[in-house]
Curated annotation (Swiss-Prot):
Residues 691-701 have a biased composition (Acidic residues). InterPro entries: G_GB1_RHD3_dom (IPR030386), P-loop_NTPase (IPR027417), RHD3/Sey1 (IPR008803), Sey1/RHD3-like_3HB (IPR046758). The keyword Transmembrane helix applies. Residues 772-774 are lumenal. The chain crosses the membrane at residues 751-771, 775-795. This is Protein SEY1. PROSITE patterns: G_GB1_RHD3 (PS51715). Keywords: Endoplasmic reticulum, GTP-binding, Hydrolase, Membrane, Nucleotide-binding, Transmembrane, Transmembrane helix. GO terms for biological process: endoplasmic reticulum membrane fusion. The lineage of its organism: Eukaryota, Fungi, Dikarya, Ascomycota, Pezizomycotina. It is an enzyme of class 3 (hydrolase). It is a multi-pass membrane protein. GTP binds at G60, S61, Q62, S63, T64, G65, K66, S67. Belongs to the TRAFAC class dynamin-like GTPase superfamily. GB1/RHD3 GTPase family. RHD3 subfamily.
Length: 873
């Protein structure tokens, strides 16, 4: 919209920057409010001013020069009436910011005026266009009074003393609507300044006289008003202050008009009441400018457009205008707007941290976010500060309520971040605590030195708590209740205690495992020695270095004693190491109870290993062979035909057979009963957990639910296995016996006595030659000494045995090669066939003879063959 060649923002215009250059139409002649008012205030940089702005409205009859006065006084460009026409120019309500006023000397009076003066040009009254329709007149007056600090009444000097000409009808309307407003807002009781500018002032009538005339007329109008209850005795000066100024004729005295306008403009600045100077009412007189703080409607500049629109909406819809309610509604609206704007900046600062935290939680790996605490504090401080800066100007109760709501929104999100940060610190702290303790324990184990597990846990726990508190303090936001992290710290400490206890139990489990391995090693060596002694039936083999061979009957006594001693030593080691873990008595008791059960399992597994069929049969055979092949002195026997092989064989076999029932049951020789395993292990400790029992092997006679008795637990070889061992051992023993018998029979052949005489006669010359030759004699002497030493060492038997074995092997090899040679030729095959025929014819006689000479040897042949097979296995 263009007025006087200048651009204005009209209602409904499509706007760009130049439309706001000289002002804006607030309300058009059709009573439509301009929604672009806020854009104009932003364009003029008034919005950030807060309360540092002033609003002036001008009233007066149509075509009396109101717009001209404003343009001259404030440098605005409101539309003015053409000098060639007499018609309405200002339609509706217009608003423009003061543009400054240049003096003739080039000085800028803007430096003397207050900042951000908004000038509102109101449509003139008593115009022919509206005639008797005073609705817009009343509504515009109410709007101006509700929003403006200063109401300029533009009248001519010759109109003073008139009713309509002096706008007394309009002022009566102003007073009436003012009473309505004040009735709604008795607490604040806002005041306004009625500034009468008397145009075409000649000076003939003093300004003071004109002032008195106007005040008398105003008081008369005020007294004639029908006042609400409680305001019957109120005075006009309770609600209004008055100021007066005269201006010369613009056309007849242009230079003087300009000078007076410049002087008048200097009054539009901030003023104050001087309590030392009182006016007729008894209040302090106004000093300085005309803008007093009590005139200001206390509507921040950024909310003025919304406030004005709300006021006009109430007015145009003929609703009772309630300024406090409008101020509250404005405060709610603006506080919500400011809150949203503040939250945008808050989102930019906090959303990245929320996204990172949510992503880490979704990935199952919460992370401690660096810089979160400072970001939270800065974001909250800036948000609240920015809100306070913008919103604290509005209604205090609404401002406080909206501030609390904003803080709740901010704190809700910050609390979630805070708790997420503590949760991540909790989880990472627990993990680092576990890893640190484990690493320290491994380092102590690698050094080979003893380490104090309790001290390690105490040290790492202290470091973990310090780190958690450091993270928590770094994330704390001051002046917030939710920043108290003592509950989370207490929970963290409890979890550290739980994890520390779990690590201690795990370490005790590992200690128990190491002790168990130590027990297994010691038991393995000791039990091997005891069972190896069973495999030797001769003195010296399984006997100690000094003393006699231990009795086979006391085998289980020795095993039990060794077992008890080793486990007691292990318990001592376990208790000593457990003391460095700061373990409780209950935990030590559970550990010892588990150690005893595990140790019995190790012993039983070792015994079962020794009792395997192959192992026990081998030991029985070795025991029998030692008793059969060696004499009581441990010397190997050389079987001769006159030896009582049958008796020796029977004694050795029966002695070895007694081991099978002995080994079949774990019994102590003194009591002939199983050892007190149930009492030795003891009852299950009351502090034992299911986890302590889940990896334990049930033990008969100890665990009631196992269904096995102690006698069954101590049975090492079942009846079926005993019988099988007996049969197989006898077969093995029979084979050894047959071998011995063959050896004795093979030595029956003797050299005839005449052979020695023949040897002496035929070898006499050689004997004499040897005796006469020193070399031969020396060789003979050495051979004789060697034979004597061999005899003294009782080595002739083994030498002969080895010689016979070598000769037998050579004979067998010769026979094999001869057979291969014969099979390779036709003549050899014919000779072998003839030899086999003769052997078949004489088989019966030879077999009969063998039966007679061996005394029933043929009846035992099958047993001998089976024994040979077992011996080969």
């Amino acid at each position: 919209m263009v007025a006087n060649g200048h651009f204005f923002a009209g209602v409904g215009d499509v706007l760009d920057g130049k439309n706001y250059e000289h002002g804006v139409q607030v309300v058009d002649e059709e009573k439509e409010f301009n929604p672009n008012l806020s854009n104009y205030l932003t364009y003029e940089n008034v919005t950030p001013a807060g309360f540092n702005y002033h609003l002036i409205s001008v009233f007066g009859s149509q075509s009396t020069g109101k717009s001209t006065l404003l343009n001259s006084l404030f440098g605005t460009h409101f539309s003015v009436m053409s000098e060639t026409e007499r018609r309405q120019t200002t339609k509706g309500i217009w608003l423009s910011k003061n543009k400054g006023l240049k003096s003739d000397k080039g000085q800028d009076n803007q430096t003397k005026m207050a900042d951000n003066i908004l000038v509102m040009d109101v449509e003139g009254t008593d115009g022919r266009e509206r005639g008797e329709d005073q609705d817009f007149e009343r509504k515009s007056a109410l709007f101006a009074l509700a929003t403006s600090e200063v109401l300029i009444v533009n009248i001519w000097e010759h109109q003073v003393g008139l009713y309509q000409g002096a706008n007394m009808g309009l002022l009566k309307t102003v007073f009436e609507v003012n009473l309505e407003l004040f009735l709604k807002d008795k607490r604040s009781n806002p005041r306004s300044l009625l500034f009468f500018v008397i145009r075409d002032f000649l000076g003939t009538t003093p300004l003071q006289n004109l002032q008195n005339t106007l005040l008398q007329d105003l008081n008369r109008i005020w007294n004639s008003l029908s006042k609400p209850a409680g305001l019957e005795n109120s005075s006009i000066t309770d609600y209004f202050d008055f100021a007066f100024a005269g201006l010369p004729h613009k056309n007849f005295q242009p230079e003087k008009f300009v000078d007076e306008v410049q002087k008048l403009s200097t009054r539009f600045c901030d003023g104050h009441r001087d309590p030392n100077k009182t006016d007729a009412k008894g209040t302090g007189s106004i000093e300085g400018g005309i803008f007093l703080p009590e005139y200001h409607r206390r509507i921040p500049a950024d909310g003025f457009a919304v406030y004005a629109e709300g006021i006009w909406d109430q007015i145009v819809n003929n609703k009772d205008l309630d300024l406090p309610t409008q101020q509250e509604l404005l405060a709610q609206f603006r506080c919500d707007e400011i809150s949203r704007e503040v939250l945008v900046a808050f989102d930019e600062a906090i959303s990245p941290f929320e996204a990172k935290q949510a992503e880490a939680v979704q990935a199952g790996n919460p992370q401690v976010l660096g810089g979160l605490g400072s970001a939270m504090r800065n974001a909250r401080m800036k948000s609240v500060k920015n809100f306070d800066t913008e919103a604290s100007r509005y209604h205090k109760r609404v401002y406080q309520m909206k501030k609390s709501e904003l803080q709740d929104k901010i704190d809700f999100r910050l609390k979630a971040l805070f708790l997420g940060q503590l949760s991540a610190a909790h989880r990472s702290g627990i993990q680092e605590f576990t890893e640190s303790v484990t690493a320290a324990v491994k380092a102590g184990q690698k050094r080979g030195a003893s380490y104090d597990f309790a001290e390690i846990v105490k040290k790492e726990r202290k470091l973990a708590i310090e780190k958690f508190e450091q993270e928590a303090r770094a994330t704390v936001v001051e002046d917030t209740q939710w920043s108290n992290y003592q509950q989370e710290l207490s929970l963290y400490q409890k979890d550290l205690e739980i994890i520390g206890g779990q690590l201690r139990r795990d370490e005790m489990r590992r200690l128990a495992t190491r002790v168990e391995r130590w027990v297994r090693s010691r038991l393995g060596e000791s039990i091997d020695l005891e069972f190896n002694a069973i495999g030797s039936g001769r003195s010296g083999s399984g006997a100690p270095e000094f003393g006699d061979k231990p009795s086979e009957k006391s085998l289980w006594d020795r095993v039990w004693t060794l077992f008890i001693d080793i486990v007691l030593d292990a318990e001592r080691r376990f208790t000593e190491r457990a003391s460095s873990f700061d373990a409780s008595i209950d935990e030590v008791d559970v550990g010892l109870w588990r150690l005893r059960r595990k140790s019995w399992g190790v012993l039983r597994a070792k015994i079962d290993e020794e009792m395997m069929e192959g192992n026990i049969l081998l030991k029985l055979r070795e025991n029998f062979e030692d008793k059969f092949r060696y004499d009581d002195a441990g010397v190997p026997r050389i079987w001769r035909p006159n030896d009582d092989i049958e008796s020796i064989y029977t004694r050795a076999r029966e002695s070895t057979l007694t081991l099978i029932p002995l080994l079949s049951r774990f019994r102590l020789s003194e009591t002939n009963a199983p050892p007190p395993l149930d009492k030795w292990i003891g009852h299950t400790p009351s502090s034992a957990t299911p986890a302590d029992e889940e990896d334990l092997t049930p033990i008969g006679g100890v665990d009631e639910d196992e269904g096995k008795s102690l006698e069954e637990e101590m049975t090492m070889i079942g009846e079926a296995k005993k019988q099988d061992l007996t049969v197989r051992f006898k077969k093995t023993a029979d084979g050894v016996y047959v071998e011995a018998k063959r050896s004795a029979i093979g030595g029956i052949t003797q050299v005839p006595l005449y052979f020695y005489g023949l040897l002496l006669a035929l070898g006499w010359n050689e004997i004499v030659a040897v005796l006469r030759n020193p070399a031969y004699f020396l060789l003979l002497f050495v051979c004789a000494v060697t034979a004597y030493v061999t005899y003294q060492l009782n080595l002739w038997g083994p030498i002969i045995k080895m010689t016979e074995a070598a000769s037998q092997q050579a004979l067998m090899e010769g026979k094999r090669r001869l057979r291969e040679f014969l099979e390779a030729s036709d003549t050899g095959l014919q000779t072998m066939a003839m030899s086999e025929g003769r052997n078949a014819e004489g088989y019966d006689m030879s077999n009969m003879k063998n039966r007679k000479s061996a005394g029933g040897y043929q009846n035992n042949r099958s047993h001998i063959d089976d024994a040979d097979d077992d011996d080969d296995f």
